[in-house]
Regions:
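General marker for long, soluble alpha-helical cores
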Residues: 2-180
């Protein structure tokens, strides 16, 4: 009789909603994509991977090729330990590099998208691109997701790289970077 309720005076509790400290994984033991997924409120590591690639793409668009190469040089850790072949050997540095060969080539030969002009990336355009290119549903807070990627990324970088990236980010996005 598993469906029978014995004590009707107690509220019904969904066991999946109970946080058991024995089952919780300490944040320092989470992988890069798990951190992005949990902190950003994303459904799975594939969503975390996709949005991380977009945030990284917009960040690279703001930087010189040399600065982007410095960052990539520090991101050689496994992004998500799993048995799934698609994510199995994925390094954080691979998320930093653009997966589209043409875009990757163009980003290496063009100057940073800063300063006056129609291609300038300010904070609003940064967040707009993340939301649109990342395919974020309207229920997901784009700033929360960006901060999730930023905080997971900062944990992988030296203080010198963290400061270098901050110097390239526009106003409000720089504040998000510093808060992460």
């Amino acid at each position: 009789m598993p469906d029978e309720t014995l004590r009707k005076d107690l509220p019904e509790v969904d066991p999946s909603e109970i946080e058991d400290s024995r089952a919780a994984i300490a944040d320092e033991h989470r992988s890069f994509l798990e951190k992005v997924m949990v902190r950003g409120g994303l459904a799975d590591p594939y969503d975390a991977r996709d949005i991380t690639e977009v945030v990284f793409r917009v960040m690279r668009d703001l930087m010189t090729t040399q600065a982007a190469d410095h960052v990539e040089g520090e991101l050689h850790k496994q992004a998500y330990p799993t048995e799934e072949k698609e994510l199995q050997k994925l390094e954080i540095a691979e998320l930093w590099r653009d997966t589209n060969p043409l875009v990757g080539f163009l980003s290496r030969v063009r100057p940073p998208w800063q300063g006056p002009g129609i291609f300038k990336i300010d904070s609003d355009r940064f967040l707009f691109r993340v939301a649109n290119e990342g395919g974020l549903p309207p229920t997901v807070d784009r700033e929360q997701v960006v901060k999730a990627v930023f905080s997971a990324t900062k944990e992988e970088l030296s203080e010198e790289r963290i400061q270098e990236i901050a110097s390239w980010l526009p106003g409000h996005v720089r504040e998000l970077w510093e808060q992460a």
